[in-house]
């Protein structure tokens, strides 16, 4: 059967999500999930009917939260589908290209590869910021420029001034896609206010992280109405299951937003605990993080990762040499992780 697949698919190395990698243990800090398990009510009496393509109450609720108009919002099956929609809608296969800046989220490249779209890599600088001169030199045939802030896996914020420069240099040439999956942990750093000025800006959001709804698979794309209308041409007819829409509206209600805000504060305290605790271990470097995870450099990253795995503490290995990404869990999980790493280096 494999020989019948498209050539790009035969050669494709799939994205290794945390669940695909697997593992067994009682401390799971490998997928940037929330440790909170919130309860919701759903009405299963309407499951015989299809959902709306873009449920109005859900779109209005997220528009209110994000500070935009409903016509500037599109919901999809996670932000990953938003990535695919943008590539399908704006990139001609075997002609156009996307540009991304590693180390960063791996699905930009994989999604482009599955659609036969060229991937241009412009690595981040040594302090993990945009290399604007190199980006400008590589914009030929580029339709989409993906920027993740806070960046995954490094955790840092991309400089706002550089984002504006990027938007300026790509006007009438390409769309800048800001991946703000983790922006709810630092909302002051959002670029949503730039939508009014830059029609070539699109923003990816999700309920997976700060809203503790990774299993819901609910994402959003924010952009000007003209761009959203293009995406509506290629999205599936019924992309949002009825229970997903109902739960999303509850999560975005005043009570849901208050709970999310409290949980973000709780995770911020645990992140600080992890950062301080690991920084005290000789030879360990903890990079400043703005999401619900930290990138940590160890003297022997691969060995530490394997030792933690065997101890039932499941972390996320990183493409950056000797670096491991650690999600921020509840306090007990953070304490167990810090204690294990301290003992490992004694």
Curated annotation (Swiss-Prot):
Catalytic activity of the protein: L-histidinol phosphate + 2-oxoglutarate = 3-(imidazol-4-yl)-2-oxopropyl phosphate + L-glutamate
Keywords for the protein's UniProt record, in alphabetical order: Amino-acid biosynthesis, Aminotransferase, Histidine biosynthesis, Pyridoxal phosphate, Transferase
A single GO molecular function term of this UniProt record: histidinol-phosphate transaminase activity
Pfam family, one: Aminotran_1_2
Listed GO biological process terms: L-histidine biosynthetic process
Cofactors, names only: pyridoxal 5'-phosphate
EC number from the UniProt entry: 2.6.1.9
Pathway in which this enzyme or protein is active: Amino-acid biosynthesis; L-histidine biosynthesis; L-histidine from 5-phospho-alpha-D-ribose 1-diphosphate: step 7/9
Source organism, top-level taxon: Bacteria
Modification N6-(pyridoxal phosphate)lysine, positions: 209
NCBIfam families: hisC
Assembly behavior: Homodimer.
Protein family (similarity comment): Belongs to the class-II pyridoxal-phosphate-dependent aminotransferase family. Histidinol-phosphate aminotransferase subfamily.
Protein name: Histidinol-phosphate aminotransferase
